[in-house]
Amino acid sequence: MARGPKKHLKRVAAPKHWMLDKLTGVFAPRPSTGPHKLRECLPLIIFLRNRLKYALTGDEVKKICMQRFIKIDGKVRVDVTYPAGFMDVISIEKTGEHFRLVYDTKGRFAVHRITAEEAKYKLCKVRKITVGTKGIPHLVTHDARTIRYPDPVIKVNDTVRIDLGSGKITSFIKFDTGNVCMVIGGANLGRVGVITNRERHPGSFDVVHVKDASGNSFATRISNIFVIGNGNKPWISLPRGKGIRLTIAEERDKRLAAKQSSG
């Protein structure tokens, strides 16, 4: 009989987007409980060791973290398996580097460097709005923040911009047609485009149609849509490729062109 939470994670059962090879060990780091789900997060150890190559082993990552060099969303994190997720800002004081976790078009977390100015805020999707004890309204975001007394105009699926120093909402974007969004789940994960229309299906999932910058259209569930800007101006910088997914033939041509120019 299972007693309590699972403490291990086998390498073959780890999320594919962590990109761990299955032959270098049996186990993968199991993320701690935190603001992001196991299959939608990137543990700090994988980011520092496998992505940035700042350490060779887990022990080295631990030594880096225990010196309190790593901040996530402005807070020092010493847990090597802390689950960092979509839109989180990772800052390394010692090197003066800042990263934002956003998806590339293949659905993996890109190592996306940002400026110190951009590292002061993050965008959060509003998951639900409730009225708590004594009639205090509050909203819950995709990264498990609870913010009391929000602007009554803000509704579910809107995006709020949060100042990481104070934790307060500075502005917000309505979920509306014509706004630019990023897909954060499903087969189109990581694609960026403008919302063209929303099909309402009472009792089921609403479907949202999106058109990307190169004119390709696709549809996904409303729960997979994260609005990132007003009109076609995103409020955050995007990783290389700007969220436009290429076809296999286009990728091949791009590779060949790069090979010829370097050769």
UniProtKB/Swiss-Prot annotation:
Disulfide bonds: none annotated. Pfam families: 40S_S4_C, KOW, Ribosomal_S4e, RS4NT. Residues 42-104 form the S4 RNA-binding domain. Keywords: Ribonucleoprotein, Ribosomal protein, RNA-binding, rRNA-binding. One of its GO terms (cellular component) is cytosolic small ribosomal subunit. GO terms for molecular function: rRNA binding; structural constituent of ribosome. HAMAP family: Ribosomal_eS4. Belongs to the eukaryotic ribosomal protein eS4 family. This is Small ribosomal subunit protein eS4, Y isoform 1.
